[in-house]
Every structure is written in structure tokens, then in C-alpha cells.
Amino acid sequence: MFLLYEYDIFWAFLIISSAIPFLAFLISGILSPIRKGPEKLSSYESGIEPIGDAWLQFRIRYYMFALVFVVFDVETVFLYPWAMSFDVLGVSAFIEAFIFVLILILGLVYAWRKGALEWS
């Protein structure tokens, strides 16, 4: 039988861990001075006035490369628990993981052909 009172500690932890950052922002907003001047509104670059355009734009290739990295990083997060319990899960879990890896390999081939992995 599923009993909700068994999760009291979980809910208390969730509420407290959600309230701490909120309270930190609230208290810092209340205690901080509200003085806006030219120094406050200027760009800060290691204590030195910025020279030239302070806004640097990255090329789109970097974003594509980072996106492919994130996809395969998430793949590792999903496959690690599967690898740790491989002997317990059986053949059906192996087939599911194989299909998952196959889809990711197809995505890698697609990204490779589209040039997402070319840095130049």
C-alpha cells in the first residue's frame, strides 16, 4: 500500500532546499543599498574601463559543437546506471539500451554529414 506519510522527510527537504535560495535573494535585496550612479551602471572589466566593444559574439559553429557535446554527455548520464546494473536487468534492457545507442549514433552521423563537427 502506498502511504504518503512515508515521504514527509522528502517533502520537508524539498521545501527547505527551495526556500533557502529564495530567502537568500530576498534578504540580499532588502539589505543592499539602492544607489544608482554612473559607476554602478558602467561595465566592469577587472577594475579597468573596457576598451572598444565589450560585447563579444561567438560563432555559430561553437554552439553546434557545444550542443553535440551536451547530447553525448547526457547519453553518458543515462548509460552509466544501465551499465552498473547490466547483469540484473536482462536481455530486454540490453535491447532497449542498444536501440538508444543506435539512435544516438544515427544522430552523430547526421551531425557529422551536416558539418556540425567541423571547427573551421
UniProtKB/Swiss-Prot annotation:
It is an enzyme of class 7 (translocase). Keywords: Chloroplast, Membrane, NAD, NADP, Plastid, Plastoquinone, Quinone, Thylakoid, Translocase, Transmembrane, Transmembrane helix, Transport. Its main location: plastid. GO terms for molecular function: NADH dehydrogenase (ubiquinone) activity; quinone binding. It is found in: Plastid, Chloroplast thylakoid membrane. NDH shuttles electrons from NAD(P)H:plastoquinone, via FMN and iron-sulfur (Fe-S) centers, to quinones in the photosynthetic chain and possibly in a chloroplast respiratory chain. The immediate electron acceptor for the enzyme in this species is believed to be plastoquinone. Couples the redox reaction to proton translocation, and thus conserves the redox energy in a proton gradient. NDH is composed of at least 16 different subunits, 5 of which are encoded in the nucleus. This is NAD(P)H-quinone oxidoreductase subunit 3, chloroplastic. It comes from Aethionema cordifolium (Lebanon stonecress). The lineage of its organism: Eukaryota, Viridiplantae, Streptophyta, Embryophyta, Tracheophyta.
